[in-house]
């Protein structure tokens, strides 16, 4: 439920078995939940990033840090009053917030609705690779610039797709065969990534305290659009990707990424095999999930 666009008095059920609050909620909702606490059943706070430490994550845009920190700060006391338990999405978050006795709730892949899905028999576009990051991944977007430039020079048939605003378009404008797509909402992106097809997806993750607490959800995105993935050999991917089987782990050295991308683009059959194993892992291997 999108609490930003709904009135709790009109949209909340008569009785709920459990209420999950993800990251933060508007004060109006938190105050209403406090008054109507008897209708809520169990109330769980789900932390899927290190939101309390976001202000110190200098790799994130300042505006994003300030907005996220303020939303968390103003509702913190009410959340502490309301919530029975805390769920976290990664072992690193569980370690950092051990004083809250959190329960580990690792993300797992949920297939998109059938009406959104492309055909699994549909082949990915050969020599097509992509990075689907947001403004919160600006350092990775900048880090990939020389990598993409070298790959495009080495593979004249290669096409690269990235998401971003005018800043990203300006950054990549001199590199041939690069498509910069405008940012999307999550429902829009889910629909898009369920129908588009690429041969290779990139998931660089620079080694910072904030990134080390992230989860491995890029694996699900990359697999959804039919691609094999290249992932940073660091948290959160180092413990999740089986190198050479469900993806490739690569050190955060740009020349290593150039070599790995070029090699993978020139071997579409191997990319297909890696994607198939990753898809099987996404659908059949699930991490920890607390009992309700």
PLM feature spans:
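Conserved catalytic-core segment of nucleotide-activated headgroup transferases in glycan assembly
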Residues: 1, 109-195
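Conserved acidic donor-binding segment of nucleotide-sugar-dependent glycosyltransferases
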Residues: 241-254, 262-269
């Amino acid at each position: 439920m999108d609490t930003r666009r709904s009135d709790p008095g009109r949209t909340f059920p008569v009785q709920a078995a459990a209420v999950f609050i993800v990251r933060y909620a508007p004060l109006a909702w938190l105050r209403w939940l406090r008054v109507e606490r008897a209708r809520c059943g169990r109330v769980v706070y789900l932390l899927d990033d290190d939101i309390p430490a976001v202000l110190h994550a200098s790799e994130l845009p300042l505006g994003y840090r300030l907005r996220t920190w303020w939303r968390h700060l103003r509702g913190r006391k009410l959340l502490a009053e309301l919530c029975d338990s805390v769920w976290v999405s990664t072992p690193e978050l569980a370690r950092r917030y051990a004083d809250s006795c959190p329960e580990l709730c690792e993300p797992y892949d949920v297939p998109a609705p059938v009406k959104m899905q492309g055909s699994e028999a549909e082949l990915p576009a050969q020599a097509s690779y992509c990075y689907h990051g947001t403004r919160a991944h600006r350092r990775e977007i900048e880090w990939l610039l020389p990598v993409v430039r070298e790959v495009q020079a080495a593979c004249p048939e290669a096409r690269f797709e990235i998401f971003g605003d005018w800043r990203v378009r300006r950054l990549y404008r001199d590199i041939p065969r690069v498509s910069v797509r405008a940012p999307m909402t999550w429902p829009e992106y889910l629909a898009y990534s369920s129908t588009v097809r690429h041969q290779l997806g990139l998931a660089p993750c620079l080694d910072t305290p904030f990134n080390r607490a992230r989860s491995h959800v890029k694996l699900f995105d990359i697999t959804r659009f039919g691609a094999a993935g290249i992932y940073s050999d660091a948290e959160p991917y180092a413990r999740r990707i089986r190198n050479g089987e469900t993806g490739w782990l690569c050190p955060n050295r740009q020349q290593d990424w150039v070599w790995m991308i070029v090699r993978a683009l020139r071997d579409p059959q191997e990319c297909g095999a890696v994607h198939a194993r990753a898809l099987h892992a996404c659908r059949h291997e699930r991490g920890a999930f607390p009992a309700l």
